[in-house]
Amino acid sequence: MKVITTAQAAALVQSGWTVASAGFVGAGHAEGVTEALEQRFLREALPRDLTLVYSAGQGDRGARGVNHFGNVGMTRAVVGGHWRSATRLATLAMTEQCEGFNLPQGVLTHLYRAIAGGKPGVLTKIGLHTFVDPRVEKDARYHGGAVNQRARDAIAAGTANWVEAVDFRGDEYLFYPSFRIDCALIRCTASDTRGNLSTHREAFHHELLAMAQAAHNSGGIVIAQVESVVDYHETLQAIHVPGILVDYVVVSEQPGHHLMTFAEAYNEAYVRPWRGEAAEAAERAKEAEVLPDASAPLDARTIVQRRAVMELAARKPRVVNLGVGMPAAVGALAHQAGLGGFTLTVEAGPIGGTPADGLSFGASAYPEAVVDQPAQFDFYEGGGIDLAILGLAEL
């Protein structure tokens, strides 16, 4: 492991590489490194023609996060599980300045594990009979995950192959092939002198380990942004990425590059477990400023959210997933109403507690546990939840 500057990290990334970026909305993104990458491109027109891969959206719908890759010529293709946070990348795709692909978020996290394990890819039913399905001859709405004409042209030319339809044991599946990762950009809290990385001040650890393993076993490099380098870690449990996977460590050079989330410099509630009753948890969450203001005006958004709370009360589910957008505040409203008897989960990894909203979405105040994002999607895909409250553009 070698400690380098953000500028030195940016200089390592070569044109044509596939770069995987870890993070989740406003948390866990290596902001200092990606900002330096963008500055290098604007200064030198390098690196060019990158393929950017990320599972959860990472950004503030403005300039931060993976939006740093949103320059014409810098990025050739984008493969992401969520685009709303990455408005600059969306503009590139919609103006045909890059290939754009929208693949299932959970599948992408599982692909990191498959790549790490030397497996050919991920075989799943996730994405069947949706726009991710590549069988355009069956339905004109199927596009293999392509979000623009440039991506569809790449599929037709055989230069892009992110998903295939296959028959397996007499049933139909989608197969997502493994691919090489040349560089993984991850963020943790601290590194020791051997490169072992802790996450004790991070809201969650999403796909850090799987991504680092995937890049390392692809023959690529792993660049980790941290707050500090220490002689040793206080506890073994804090270490989430072992140093054998880490090539370079970058110490954050500006406070704004290592916020806990893009909305909060630090929130102790996201890393502290709480096992009390719902009413008490709601009070703690209120202290942590994650509950909505009860005196706020009653608008259409709040009415929809309260209607979802009524479903929680009526259905009495045991395990619930809350999606991004309007659903993110449902847990806080439910706790505010004193409802209990259920456990809220977020795909980033938190289980229990009160999920945060906005640019802190993905975190949870006083969770009972936090697991890796790929493991959370194992649980979801296997049918582990009783109720999901999701955000949709149109139904």
Give residue ranges: language-model regions.
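Conserved alpha/beta enzyme-core scaffold
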Residues: M1-L395
